[in-house]
């Protein structure tokens, strides 16, 4: 087994614990947990699961998981050890600009990471939930500045998810925004 998709269903902490103990899990290249609500999970459970797959994982999809910022903070150290990671998506979750900055800093060493899909920062939405494109542009510029400070070229997509359906996802801008910075010698 090199790809595993468990999507849009209810899992318990016990289910994820058992999954992390499977013998073949260390060979996993793709893990898709999109739509699995993680709000009530201990951050340690996901951390342990990612530890098991860190050496081989190439694709990680945590879309629409309701992952909390404390859970995300908990997995950042192990996420930065996923040296083979190429694609990572957190679309459909609510993330602040502060946690997105931490995420960018922790993943900057992942040289294979080429496709990054993140939600528009929660600060780009009005109190009523409407996406404010002007504010999003300002936050995008701030993210570009952060990536330039980190010194590694990368491409990132920001998305809004007006509803849980993948087909209604809109990316801003329609192309990824690129950071063309180079590490100094």
Segments the model singles out, each with a brief description of its role:
Residues 9, 22, 65, 81-82, ...:
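Generic recognition of cysteine residues
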Residues 83-86, 97-185:
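C-terminal capping region of solenoid repeat domains
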Residues 17-26, 46-55, 76-83, 103-109, ...:
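Leucine-rich repeat
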Residues 5-9, 35-39, 61-68, 78, ...:
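Amphipathic alpha-helical protein-protein interaction segments
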Residues 22-71:
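Eukaryotic tandem repeat interaction scaffolds
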Residues 10-17, 37-44, 66-73, 94-99, ...:
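Short, solvent-exposed loop/turn at the beta-strand->alpha-helix junction
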Residues 4, 16-18, 45-47, 52, ...:
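Sparse, context-dependent recognition of short Cys/His-centered cofactor- or disulfide-binding micro-motifs
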Residues 2-7, 26-34, 57-63, 85-90, ...:
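Conserved hydrophobic beta-strand positions in leucine-rich repeat
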């Amino acid at each position: 087994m090199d790809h595993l998709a468990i999507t849009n269903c209810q899992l318990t902490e016990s289910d994820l614990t058992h999954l992390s103990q499977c013998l073949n899990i260390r060979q996993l290249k793709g893990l898709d947990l999109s739509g699995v609500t993680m709000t009530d999970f201990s951050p340690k459970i996901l951390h342990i699961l990612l530890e098991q797959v860190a050496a081989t994982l190439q694709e990680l999809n945590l879309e629409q998981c309701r992952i909390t910022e404390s859970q995300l903070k908990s997995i950042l150290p192990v996420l930065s050890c996923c040296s083979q990671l190429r694609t990572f998506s957190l679309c459909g979750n609510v993330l602040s600009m502060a946690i997105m900055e931490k995420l960018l800093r922790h993943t900057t060493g992942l040289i294979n990471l080429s496709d990054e899909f993140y939600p528009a920062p929660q600060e780009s939405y009005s109190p009523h939930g409407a996406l404010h494109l002007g504010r999003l542009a300002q936050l995008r510029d701030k993210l570009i500045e952060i990536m330039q400070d980190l010194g590694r070229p990368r491409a990132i997509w920001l998305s809004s998810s007006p509803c849980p359906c993948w087909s209604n996802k809109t990316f801003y801008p329609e192309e990824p925004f690129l950071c063309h910075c180079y590490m100094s010698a």
